[in-house]
Regions:
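Metabolite-binding pocket within alpha/beta catalytic cores that recognizes anionic/polar moieties
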Residues: 1-150
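Active-site rim beta-loop-alpha module in soluble metabolic enzymes
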Residues: 137-187
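His/Asp/Glu-rich mid-to-C-terminal helical/loop segments that flank catalytic regions of hydrolases
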Residues: 222-254
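Short acidic/polar active-site loop segments enriched in Thr and Asp
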Residues: 97-98, 190, 209
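Flexible, glycine/charged-enriched surface loops at secondary-structure junctions
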Residues: 49-54, 159-165, 252-254
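Zn-dependent metallopeptidase/amidohydrolase metal-coordination segment
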Residues: 197-233
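Generic non-transmembrane alpha-helical segments
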Residues: 150-158, 202, 244-252
Length: 254
């Protein structure tokens, strides 16, 4: 009967929606999932722009400069793959079409010490959200070539040294074991973070562009945890990236 047929289709029961009073966001958005990184970015932004509109939508914030060559919004925090994709889904219904996932990452490579800027080419998924958006368990999620090239050109123009690299997306930072680190090092993985693979999968599912940009905040490559969240190398590099966001996001909108 009709009820049984409806029950077995892949059509969702719940859809992301725009609620009365929700704002419209520009087509380009920087999504900063990590709370400490979002708040640092918002503080930098408020110090740079003459006027910044800050408001809460659902469980995350939107921080939008009133004047920019390319209108854009800073969004976050939304830590972890499920929360980041919930935020991404909401941003899409509010108008986002190009989304840069920005934040800290741990380094698995000696050539990417604290403060290094990493432009991901692929994300190897070890989280659960991407599977629900059609990602295959054994296939990395790839950043689109034009987005990658645009970001790299904008970083070079801003004088920010950077390197390409593959990243590992995990749901469980406390399960970043020595064995796993060695296995991913052997695969040429440069960094580890918590959201990019899921956001790439959801972006592909919804037909929007998603790219990533990370600053190394801590090191795991020696199989010990070296924290650098307050290290001047990380703080300065993250500030430079935030200051360059208008150009970086403009490269995605081009």
């Amino acid at each position: 009967n009709d009820q049984v047929e409806r029950a077995v289709t892949d059509e969702p029961i719940i859809e992301p929606t725009r609620r009365p009073g929700d704002p419209t966001v520009p087509g380009v958005v920087a999504l900063v999932p990590a709370p400490f990184a979002y708040h640092r970015a918002a503080r930098h932004l408020k110090g740079l722009a003459d006027e910044v509109r800050d408001r809460r939508v659902d469980f995350f914030h939107l921080c939008q400069p009133s004047e920019a060559p390319v209108p854009w919004t800073l969004a976050g925090p939304a830590l972890g793959a499920p929360a980041a994709v919930l935020a991404l889904e909401k941003l899409i219904v509010l108008g986002a079409r190009r989304i840069l996932v920005l934040g800290p990452c741990g380094s698995l490579a000696t050539e990417a010490p604290i403060g290094a800027v990493v432009v991901p080419t692929e994300a190897v998924s070890e989280e659960g959200t991407s599977r629900l958006y059609g990602a295959e368990a054994d296939r990395p999620l790839t950043v689109a070539g034009p987005a990658l090239q645009g970001l790299e050109a904008a970083l070079a123009e801003a004088g920010i040294p950077h390197q390409r690299g593959r990243v590992w997306t995990t749901d469980a930072p406390y399960r970043e074991t020595r064995r796993k680190v060695q296995e991913f090092q052997a695969q040429g993985i440069v960094g580890v973070e918590m959201e990019l693979a899921a956001c790439l999968a959801a972006g592909a599912f919804r037909g929007v562009t998603v790219a990533g940009l990370f600053v190394v905040s801590d090191e795991l490559f020696a199989l010990q945890w070296v924290k650098g969240f307050d290290n001047p190398g990380f703080v300065d590099a993250f500030r430079q990236v935030v200051e360059a966001l208008p150009a970086l996001l403009g490269s995605l909108a081009a």
